[in-house]
Every structure is written in structure tokens, then in C-alpha cells.
């Protein structure tokens, strides 16, 4: 099974490289432009998609200007099944997005593999209303196979200024076994992480080429990194309170 899973995942990544690279580069350029102009990069996802927003937050080798919107009822630790119910509620996003400090010139990255549920769609639209440039990471194949749950009939892919396809199959899981008819081994976390890290790598390279110093964290487990990292925390803590220390 390991060979099958890795082979399929490699093919998905190769497809992203072949078909989505231009969108990734365009997204990276928008991220660079935002950061160069004191903007912040916001990320949102429900359920397992939220894991990707934390993957790139306060990350060694990652950008400091990253703000994950972590609304706990839509994560998993307060009740996994409950989070799925809430994700399907139209207008629920208004209960937490109103207070988010999203400004003109910021970038909002919204992740949802199925792309059918109301909360990610509403998050994208509210962020745009606040002036953000919206990047969507979704599966176009999966999304097209399912009816939208949003009252407008929209899918997440309808809300993005840039839409990047993670290539996930319907249901996300790619493996099957004899005498067991439920698919297993999802791919969207792997492909999503690669897409996000590629966007930010493109952004960092663009900033360097623009003679702008990218705000990149150094691993805290490397000697003499603390002073460098603390300066970045101090720079962004007002806009991204999650970076601060609450000891």
C-alpha cells in the first residue's frame, strides 16, 4: 500500500506542477506584494483543512506575516462531528469574521477540498468585502461532483481571485482493498501543504528580487535565532496577536 499511495501522490504533485504552477506563481507574487506593503496573509480552513493553516504559521523557514483564523468550533478538538454540522451553516461565518482584522491590501487564502460548504465560501466573500485579495485552494473535480450547500449555489471556486486545484478525487481518499469497499488514504493534506509552501517560496523569491527583506523565521532550535525571531514577532504582533507570548 505504501507504494500505491506514494505513486498516486507523486502523480498528483506532478499534475499540480504541470497545470497549476502559473497560478501558484501568481499567488506568490500577490503575497509578496501584500507583505511589501505591510499587509498580512490570512488563512482559513474548516476541519482538517485548518491543519494546513497551522502548518505555515510561526514556521521555521516560513513567513512571519501569516495569520491563521482559528475558530475553535470549526476545528476538531471541541467536537469533530459538531464542526462538520457548523461548516454547513449558511451565514455562520458572520459570527466570527466580523471581528477579524482584515484590511485592504491583505491576502486571504481559503482552503476546502470539497468546496461545497457555506462557511469557507462566506469567509472568502467576507474577506473580499473587507478588501482582501482571495486565493482559493480546492479540488475542482471533487467540487463539481457535489451539489453546493450554499444558498447561492456557489462553490468555493466561484469566490477566488486565484483558484488552485489540489487535484483530489471525489471523497479525497485514493486507495481501495479487496473485500473492503470504502476508499481510504486521503491526499489533500499532502498536496495542500506543497501548494502553500510553494506559494510562499515564490513570494520569498519575489521579495528578494525586489530588494525587500522577506520576514522569515529561523528555527528556534538553531543557536542565536531568538533575537531574529523576536524582532519579527514584535513587528507583526499587533496585527497577528497569536504570535505573542501569553505566559
UniProtKB/Swiss-Prot annotation:
GO terms (BP aspect): carbohydrate derivative metabolic process
Organism, scientific name: Listeria innocua serovar 6a (strain ATCC BAA-680 / CLIP 11262)
Protein name (record): UPF0309 protein lin2794
Stated family: Belongs to the UPF0309 family.
SUPFAM superfamilies (UniProt xref): SIS domain
GO MF term set: carbohydrate derivative binding
Domain called SIS: residue spans: 31-214
Superkingdom assignment: Bacteria
InterPro entries: RpiR-like_SIS, SIS_dom, SIS_dom_sf, SIS_GmhA/DiaA_subfam, UPF0309
Alphabetized PROSITE patterns for the sequence: SIS
PANTHER family per the UniProt record, alphabetical: PHOSPHOHEPTOSE ISOMERASE, SEDOHEPTULOSE 7-PHOSPHATE ISOMERASE / DNAA INITIATOR-ASSOCIATING FACTOR FOR REPLICATION INITIATION
